[in-house]
C-alpha cells in the first residue's frame, strides 16, 4: 500500500513539472494553444552534382615509352605541327551576302562544314592533339640561367603531334550579324555549346555550329584523337569581352553604375564557362587586349595594353605564358634575328611561347633570352584557294575535299 501511495505521489509531481514547463514555453500562459501548427523545416537543397573528372595526362612523362591501356607509346622529337583558325562561320548565307565584309570573311575564315572536314582529315592522317605548354617548358641551364627547352613527347606509336589554337574567340559584335555563334554557354547536360540565332532569328543552342563545342564532340566520338586530354589554346583579346560576354570596360565613354553592374553580371556569367573549358583540356593565351600591332606601336601603348589584358582578361582566364601576335606582326620587326625592347618587355611579363603566322610550323628557341618563337599555319579562305595549298597543307588534307565552294562566293581557286 505504501508503495502504491509513493508511486502516485511521483506521478503527480511529474505532471506538475510538465505543466510548469508548458507554461514557461508559452510566455506565462498556463494553457497551450493547440490551434497553432508547427511549420515543418525547409528541406535541404540537393547538392549540385560534381562534374565527372576529365583525365589530362602529361605526354612528356606518361607513360615514358611504355604502354597504357594496351597502347604503346614511343619517343617523338620531330616537328610539332601547329594549325590555327578564327571562329567558324555557322551560317554561310549570312556571311557571304555580298556586303562589304564578305571578302574579308572569305579570306580569313572557314565554315563549320570545312572545319569538320579538317578535323576528320587530320584524325585520319594520324595526328593527335597535344597541349602547346607540353611541347616547350622552362628550366635552368648549368649556370642557373632560365632557358626554354623542347620536350620529348611520348606518343601512341605511329601518331604525329598537332597543336591547335583558335584566335579571337571573343565573338565580336560584327560577327553577330554575319553568321557566327553569339557566345558559349553550358547546355542542359552541362557541356560547352554555342548560343546564337539562325537566319530566321530563332535562338539556337548547338554543339555543331562553333569550333569549340565541335572539337569537344569530335573528341568524345574519337577519344584517341586526344590521348592526353588536350584540346586547343584559345587566343583571346579583351576589347569586346571574352567568349561572347561583354566583360570589358570602356574609357572612351562616361562609365555609369548601370554599365558596371551589367559588366559584373557578364563576368559572373562567363566564369563557369571558363572553368568548364579549363577542366576539359582547353587553355588560354593572350592575343593582346586591343588586337594591337606589336611591330609598330609605341612601347608605352604596348605596356598599357598588356596591363589591361592582365587586369580584364587574365584575371578571369588565369595566368598564361603564351602570346599570339595580332596580325602575325612580330615585335621589333623581327623576333628571330633580334631581341628588341618590345620582345624583352613581353618576355618580362611572363610570356615564354610567342606565336606568329607563317608558311610552315616553324619554331626557334631563343639563345639570348628565355623564350621560344613559333609560326603557325592558317587554314582559311586565302590558303584554301592558294596555288601553294598542296605544298604547304597537303600533309593535313586534300583541299578539294575540304573547301565548300557551294557555300563560298565565286572567287575562284588557284589550283587544279
Predicted segment positions?
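Metal-dependent polysaccharide deacetylase catalytic core of the NodB/CE4 family, i.e.
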Residues: 83-95, 144, 148, 155-162, ...
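Sec-dependent signal peptide recognition
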Residues: 2-10
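C-terminal active-site subregion of NodB/CE4 polysaccharide deacetylases
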Residues: 51-132, 148-164, 173-176, 283, ...
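C-terminal motif of bacterial Sec signal peptides marking the signal peptidase cleavage site
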Residues: 16-19
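Membrane/wall-proximal cationic-aromatic binding patches
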Residues: 129, 135-146
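N-terminal, intrinsically disordered, polar/charged segments of Gram-positive cell-envelope systems
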Residues: 24-70
Amino acid at each position: 500500500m505504501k508503495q502504491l501511495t509513493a508511486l502516485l505521489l511521483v506521478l503527480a509531481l511529474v505532471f506538475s513539472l510538465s505543466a510548469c514547463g508548458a507554461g514557461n514555453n508559452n510566455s506565462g500562459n498556463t494553457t497551450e494553444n493547440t490551434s497553432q501548427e508547427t511549420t515543418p523545416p525547409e528541406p535541404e537543397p540537393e547538392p549540385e552534382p560534381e562534374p565527372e573528372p576529365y583525365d589530362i595526362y602529361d605526354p612528356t612523362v606518361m607513360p615514358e615509352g611504355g604502354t597504357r591501356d594496351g597502347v604503346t607509346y614511343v619517343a617523338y622529337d620531330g616537328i610539332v605541327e601547329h594549325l590555327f583558325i578564327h571562329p567558324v562561320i555557322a551560317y554561310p548565307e549570312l556571311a557571304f551576302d555580298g556586303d562589304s565584309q564578305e571578302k574579308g570573311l572569305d579570306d580569313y575564315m572557314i565554315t563549320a562544314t570545312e572545319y569538320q572536314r579538317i578535323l576528320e582529315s587530320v584524325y585520319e592522317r594520324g595526328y593527335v592533339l597535344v597541349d602547346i605548354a607540353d611541347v616547350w617548358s622552362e628550366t635552368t641551364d648549368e649556370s642557373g640561367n632560365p632557358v626554354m627547352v623542347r620536350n620529348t613527347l611520348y606518343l601512341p606509336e605511329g601518331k604525329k603531334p598537332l597543336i591547335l589554337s583558335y584566335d579571337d574567340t571573343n565573338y565580336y559584335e560584327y560577327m553577330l550579324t554575319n553568321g557566327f555563334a553569339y557566345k558559349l554557354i553550358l547546355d542542359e547536360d552541362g557541356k560547352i555549346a554555342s548560343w546564337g540565332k539562325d537566319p530566321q532569328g530563332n535562338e539556337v543552342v548547338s554543339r555543331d555550329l562553333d569550333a569549340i563545342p565541335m572539337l569537344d564532340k569530335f573528341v568524345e566520338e574519337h577519344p584517341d584523337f586526344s590521348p592526353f586530354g588536350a584540346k586547343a589554346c584559345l587566343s583571346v583579346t579583351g576589347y569586346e569581352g571574352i567568349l561572347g560576354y561583354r566583360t570589358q570596360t570602356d574609357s572612351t565613354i562616361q562609365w555609369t553604375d548601370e554599365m558596371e553592374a551589367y559588366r559584373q553580371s557578364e563576368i559572373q556569367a562567363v566564369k563557369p564557362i571558363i572553368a568548364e573549358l579549363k577542366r576539359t583540356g582547353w587553355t588560354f593565351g593572350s592575343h593582346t587586349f586591343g588586337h594591337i600591332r606589336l611591330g609598330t606601336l609605341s612601347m608605352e601603348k604596348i605596356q598599357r595594353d598588356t596591363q589591361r589584358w592582365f587586369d580584364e582578361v587574365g584575371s578571369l582566364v588565369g595566368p598564361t605564358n603564351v602570346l599570339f601576335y595580332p596580325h602575325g606582326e612580330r615585335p621589333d620587326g623581327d623576333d628571330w634575328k633580334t631581341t628588341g625592347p618590345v620582345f624583352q618587355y613581353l618576355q618580362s611579363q611572363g610570356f615564354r611561347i610567342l606565336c606568329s603566322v607563317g608558311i610552315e610550323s616553324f619554331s626557334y628557341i631563343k639563345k639570348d633570352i628565355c623564350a621560344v618563337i613559333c609560326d603557325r599555319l592558317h587554314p582559311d579562305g586565302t590558303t584554301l584557294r592558294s596555288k601553294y595549298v598542296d605544298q604547304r597543307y597537303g600533309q593535313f588534307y586534300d583541299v578539294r575535299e575540304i573547301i565548300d565552294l557551294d557555300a563560298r562566293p565565286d572567287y575562284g581557286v588557284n589550283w587544279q
